[in-house]
Amino acid sequence: MVDSKKRPGKDLDRIDRNILNELQKDGRISNVELSKRVGLSPTPCLERVRRLERQGFIQGYTALLNPHYLDASLLVFVEITLNRGAPDVFEQFNTAVQKLEEIQECHLVSGDFDYLLKTRVPDMSAYRKLLGETLLRLPGVNDTRTYVVMEEVKQSNRLVIKTR
């Protein structure tokens, strides 16, 4: 995790920010095309991309898959409340949830519950099985609340990167 007080992104210049914006739009863009879009020649553009990778601004490249084509149509969010009796319950939960491929995201949150999970499964039957056989058996789980998504109105992984 990056120290928020250091804010490494504030040191990025306009070209670095443009590179990041273009790569968010299309991670498979060729270096030649990227260099044209940001106004650099190919070699300095590639050097900047490599530097942004080394510095951790770019964590990797991935393909966005269509869950409806891959038997993962049902999107479910789950609130998890832990039994706080054990002193290391959060660490145990964190370790256990890391091992679950079905969980796409897990966030420790403030408020009325402790964690918010995001998962995709084929259907409600598969979710019931995941809940009963896996989620309720995670260390320290005291209560869950499930939200089934009826319609995905907006989904994006892009970050807002302002160009100065």
Curated annotation (Swiss-Prot):
InterPro entries noted in UniProt: ArsR-like_HTH, AsnC-type_HTH_dom, Dimeric_a/b-barrel, Tscrpt_reg_AsnC-like, Tscrpt_reg_AsnC/Lrp_C, Tscrpt_reg_HTH_AsnC-type_CS, WH-like_DNA-bd_sf, WH_DNA-bd_sf
GO BP terms in the entry: alanine catabolic process; negative regulation of DNA-templated transcription; regulation of DNA-templated transcription; response to L-leucine
Statement: the UniProt record of this protein carries the keyword Glycoprotein: no
Keyword Methyltransferase: no
Result when mutating D114E: In lrp-1 mutant
PROSITE patterns named in the record: HTH_ASNC_1 (PS00519), HTH_ASNC_2 (PS50956)
Location of the DNA-binding region in this protein: 31-50
Residues annotated as domain HTH asnC-type: 12-73
Keywords: Activator, DNA-binding, Transcription, Transcription regulation
An annotated Gene Ontology molecular function: transcription cis-regulatory region binding
CDD domains: HTH_ARSR
GO cellular component terms attached to this protein's record: cytosol; protein-DNA complex
Complexes and interactors: Homodimer.
The protein's role, per its UniProt record: Mediates a global response to leucine. Exogenous leucine affects the expression of a number of different operons; lrp mediates this effect for at least some of these operons. For example it is regulator of the branched-chain amino acid transport genes.
Record-linked NCBIfam families: PRK11169.1
Protein name per the record: Leucine-responsive regulatory protein
